[in-house]
Amino acid sequence: MTKEYKTIVEVSGPLIFLEKTEPVGYGELVQINLPDGTTKRGQVLDTSADMVVVQVFEGTVGLNEESGVVFSGETIKLPVSKDMLGRILSGAGEPLDGGPRIIPDKRVDINGASMNPYSRMPPEDFIQTGISTIDGTNTLVRGQKLPIFSGSGLPHNEIALQIARQAKVPGSDEPFAVVFAAMGITNEEAQYFMDDFEKTGALERAVVFLNLADDPAVERIVTPRMALTAAEYLAYEHDMHVLVILTDITNYCEALRQMGAAREEVPGRRGYPGYMYTDLASLYERAGVIKGIKGSVTQFSILTMPGDDITHPIPDLSGYITEGQIVVSRELHRKGIYPPINVLPSLSRLMNSGIGEGKTRDDHKAVSDQMYAAYAEGRDLRGLVAIVGKEALSERDRKMLEFADLFEDRFVRQSRDEDRTIDDTLRIAWEILAELPEAQLTRIDNKYLDKYHPAHQKSE
């Protein structure tokens, strides 16, 4: 027989505080019965010697000391099945696409099991996104966690959808799936995501979770865990390679801050809770490859930097946990370049283990290094030209300046539905590097020049 407790002593924002009468588990699900006969769901957020704090999913409007609380003894579980593929769900796992509820193979705790560090395998397989600035210079590797640092008004949603449509492990016939979770988005954005997935056919191999801006903040904290649980199930139970795309982590962190303020916690940097680093790590660290298991979980987390400030706590802490970052540039966006990814501050720390002969191509590393060096020099020269003018530059410097423009216009720029193979990306790279004198290609070995340089191929 279930017991109902009427010991509510305080209601604060999305939280209720109860006097503790018997042991309660952390994260335990709760049913709240209102005096008018309606019910709400909640979860135990904190428990002490004499008090229990419950976060209410549907908001606390209408709750008072007459409301009854029933503890279920269970944590939040996601019903999982391979039938999730092709479905659009709410942030709480409820169908949004008009389809039936998913008949589960099992119900899995959304907090997941921690991954034993010894059982992790080093990521080393290339994932092709079809976007040259990622594949060519900041390569994504299977099992990696790589965030995209963007800003308000920049096309990070379009980049996320393009990756969701195009991502694949080239040359592999192993099943590949995408789990897409959007947090705190508007109804307009949700419709845009749903339409794009359905029109392009990407939905067939995807599971989509959408948490709207007017949904409870508590649900925003649950959404990425739902997505990662679905990804782990597909990867570790069905041997699929799963790419998880989470957008927008900033909205998730704002929900954390809101919950912390409601609990009257002592705030950390800029009002965010002091445990935000640990909390973000509990999401990011669920990516990886495990010994003896064919499947893998790779993670793209998109976050908008408030005020384009890369030192803001959210991108700052994310950078410590993740394995690099892709930086979306407002300057390139103003020039009308899509995708406006600035490769210079971008970095993929695992790139070297996922490229080269047998993975991408033997010249990949050398070409990437040479383009970085030449583009960085060309960008520096733009600042010099603004002061002394083009006429003061040497012939060599003019070539570098032209290379920077070519790099942005031909390598960075591509259309929203252009899916470039790694061979396409490297071919374009060689075509623009060929505009520089060979003597300036100091980072490329002669054997690669002989094999791939367009001038050498013509002479043959």
From Swiss-Prot:
Primary localization: membrane
Gene3D superfamilies: 3.40.50.12240
PROSITE patterns membership: ATPASE_ALPHA_BETA
One GO CC annotation: proton-transporting two-sector ATPase complex, catalytic domain
InterPro entries in the cross-refs: ATP-synt_VA_C (IPR055190), ATPase_a/bsu_AS (IPR020003), ATPase_A1-cplx_bsu (IPR005724), ATPase_F1/V1/A1_a/bsu_N (IPR004100), ATPase_F1/V1/A1_a/bsu_nucl-bd (IPR000194), P-loop_NTPase (IPR027417), V-ATPase_su_B/beta (IPR022879)
Pfam families membership: ATP-synt_ab, ATP-synt_ab_N, ATP-synt_VA_C
GO BP terms: proton motive force-driven plasma membrane ATP synthesis
One GO MF term: ATP binding
Family: Belongs to the ATPase alpha/beta chains family.
Assembly behavior: Has multiple subunits with at least A(3), B(3), C, D, E, F, H, I and proteolipid K(x).
Name under which the protein is recorded: A-type ATP synthase subunit B
Protein species of origin: Methanococcoides burtonii (strain DSM 6242 / NBRC 107633 / OCM 468 / ACE-M)
Lineage per the UniProt record: Archaea, Methanobacteriati, Methanobacteriota, Stenosarchaea group, Methanomicrobia
Gene that encodes the chain: atpB
